[in-house]
Design a protein with these regions (language model features):
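Exported/periplasmic ABC-transporter solute-binding proteins
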Residues: 1-34, 39, 43, 47, ...
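Phosphopantetheine-dependent thiolation modules in NRPS/PKS and related acyl-activating systems
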Residues: 52-53
Length: 221
């Protein structure tokens, strides 16, 4: 049986799991997926790790198409995901409906969990939000970075702090036990990321890989 190797941003994990049983049965293959920060997944492909399909942010997939690592004609948007605020399950939900309210909530938090800006789309953006809200120095000692969104949310769930908050892609929040989604980031601080799939140029199972991209597209929409 063919095994399809997938390297994907963590935000697409739930989408892949939704289609996995029916796709594997229908196509007669298995999906071997790794999910983490989009930058880390790109780096693994560039380092030579075998992969048949990539799911990353649109900008990273476009760059891989330009560099010859994915097939340009296979590039397909599969989902859009908002970056959102989270708290531990059972904690009060802070008001984050405006930029000023978000600033107040972050200033009151004793821990702020989000993915590493060096690798993750949500992390890059949220670090910029903190700077935009002029909180960079004030909260520097409270920032807790995870290798990816899922790791950051698990750390938030396990936190023993009094008022921790977190931020990552909404799909990663929903997929993590022990945390709840408060709301997407407010206007002026918001981010909606387009996740895009593509077949790699080194794929040894191009037909099956293309079928996976199609299945993801149908389910994502």
């Amino acid at each position: 049986m063919t095994t399809l190797r997938l390297l994907s941003g963590g935000a697409a994990h739930g989408l892949v799991e939704r289609i996995r049983p029916s796709f594997e049965s229908r196509i007669g293959c298995t999906i071997d997926g790794t999910f983490s920060a989009v930058g880390a997944m790109r780096d693994r492909l560039l380092a030579g790790e075998p992969a048949d399909v990539m799911i990353l942010s649109r900008a990273l997939i476009d760059a891989l198409a330009k560099s010859g690592h994915v097939v340009p004609s296979s590039v397909t948007d599969v989902a859009t995901v908002a970056t959102a605020v989270a708290v531990r399950r059972g904690d009060p939900l802070p008001d984050v409906g405006t930029a000023d309210a978000l600033r107040t909530a972050l200033a009151a938090a004793d821990e702020i969990h989000f993915p590493d800006p060096a690798q993750a789309t949500a992390g890059i953006h949220f670090a910029g939000v903190i700077k935009k809200l002029d909180l960079e120095e004030q909260v520097a000692g409270r920032v807790k970075l995870g290798a990816n969104g899922a790791t950051a949310m698990r750390a938030l769930a396990a936190s023993t702090a009094k008022r921790p908050v977190g931020c990552t892609q909404e799909t990663e929040i929903r997929a993590t036990a022990g945390v709840v989604l408060v709301a997407p980031l407010p206007p002026g601080c918001d981010l909606v990321t387009t996740y895009t799939a593509a077949v790699t140029t080194r794929s040894q199972a191009a037909a099956e890989a293309s079928a996976l991209v199609v299945a993801l597209t149908i389910t994502g929409k």
